[in-house]
């Protein structure tokens, strides 16, 4: 249910007795709040003054509890959309009964449903034994299977996987991918283990998940995340298919992000970074948003900074560079580099592969200070959570913050960015490219055929016959006195009419998904007068979609 702190409408798990007076008080407060005029000239300030943040995260403003942080963002969206959900209910109930139903379903959506904690031994190459800790959280089963990555990091904790699992639920809803949210973590530093040891850990972790019913094509489908990739996903798929999924024809759909030879899909590796690019593209080309932050539309004259040169950071950098933006700085855990004339992503990638670090790159200088505070138009935090906090948010110079990482902005920092009219494109939308293409891979595995294979030659022949028909029509009309009238397509059109490959289909579908979701977020932000608060608009969209599933399915057996 809801509980109020100051002017903030918050969800809590308080008992019914404690909620009766709070419900009556909430209605009165909402009524008074709606009677106040909005400050249209500064939507960010108006929003900040109208809604406050949860006290659950305010006690540690620079290092809030990650899961409570996500719950706080959920609360903001729920407080805005509750009345609409009540109004849209088509049940033969009183207003009070409808409101109780809505609040009850919102209470179901918010918590993390299942958290599995594991410990298992492995024998290392030197003969010693080590106990490995791991977790898998399933936030919601409103849609199945659950979906979320597996990360290898010493920072993995129960709180982190719960937060990331809940983000996955809302992320999938924002981009209309029919999955519930999940996340897994293994508490290791992969740099301290050999490839043989990592394979042991990955395969044993897979078996532990399988024994507990936490993996399967229709149950729970992991994917790559921090410090994991195609190699680890291939080990997982092989382990599952060789054991518990031995008789399941869909066994390799138990995980996504696999190599092509193991049922993977073209475009998955770059999917999250490409999605970040498309997400930025949709807002940077929108004149109304650019005028609010004092920028001109388009990438042409824009500079950007990337924090984190991993999979997401690298591919985000590549696509922005390709479309005319200039990368002036890149930050990693061991240091940062700077070049106001621009850094070429391919050259930097080659240097990092050869030397193991971006430091020492000959075409850039070391950057002293925080890379998050570097002078640029677009800041892309693509590392870990809680990087932008109350302490450094006032010094951020970027006008657009594109959240490539999960949860990089704390609630207090988010509030400061709204007050400063900085456009934050939220993680719950922006880095959804990975799960979107994972969905395409999952469908490919269930259908047992690659995209384009059944139609590639048919489309190519159809387009060829169309051009020949046009040519023959022109020759019949004007004759052949000067010879034939060849129809010569341009290079771009020739590539298009040759037939869509799997990669073409994936890229096109991803671009469309990000565009459609961006339009939904813009519409919601305008509808509720949220100004630049795209995060709350995205959460409102997610809550509406998840709520509809629960409401129409019924909650008797939920």
Swiss-Prot record:
Assigned GO CC terms: mitochondrial matrix
Keywords assigned: ADP-ribosylation, Mitochondrion, NADP, Oxidoreductase, Transit peptide
Principal location class: mitochondrion
One GO BP: glutamate catabolic process
GO molecular function: glutamate dehydrogenase (NAD+) activity; glutamate dehydrogenase (NADP+) activity
Free-text description of this protein's post-translational modifications in UniProt: Stoichiometry shows that ADP-ribosylation occurs in one subunit per catalytically active homohexamer.
Transit peptide feature, positions: 1-53
Quaternary context: Homohexamer.
Function of the molecule: Important for recycling the chief excitatory neurotransmitter, glutamate, during neurotransmission.
Protein name: Glutamate dehydrogenase 2, mitochondrial
Annotated source species: Pongo pygmaeus
